Regions:
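Phosphate-binding and adjacent anionic-ligand microenvironments
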Residues: 1-67, 72-89
Length: 89
């Protein structure tokens, strides 16, 4: 019973990145991950079987907020770096 209460995912903390054209950046990131499942309810959520991330624009600043989870810490670090490179390029 106790084991089922343990969260199996590795999470990034919320990471803010300054972006000038947020709609264009989100469109480019969605195109990059074109084989993923998408949800647009709260920003852009990109889902794969073993990892996912959400990008939300700030309501008060030119920032995108990234939250990412993965099955392993290694995968979480790899994908966090990948997504941040796309955001900040």
């Amino acid at each position: 019973m106790l084991i089922s209460l343990i969260d199996p995912y590795f999470r990034s903390r919320e990471i803010n990145s300054r972006v000038e054209d947020i709609p264009e950046k989100l469109k480019n990131i969605e195109s990059y991950y074109k084989d993923a499942n998408f949800d647009h309810l709260d920003g852009l959520t990109v889902e794969y079987p073993d990892w996912w991330f959400n990008l939300r624009p700030s309501n008060t600043e030119p920032l995108i907020r990234l939250n990412l989870e993965a099955d392993t810490e290694k995968l979480m670090e790899q994908k966090k770096s990948e997504v941040l490179n796309l955001i900040r390029s």
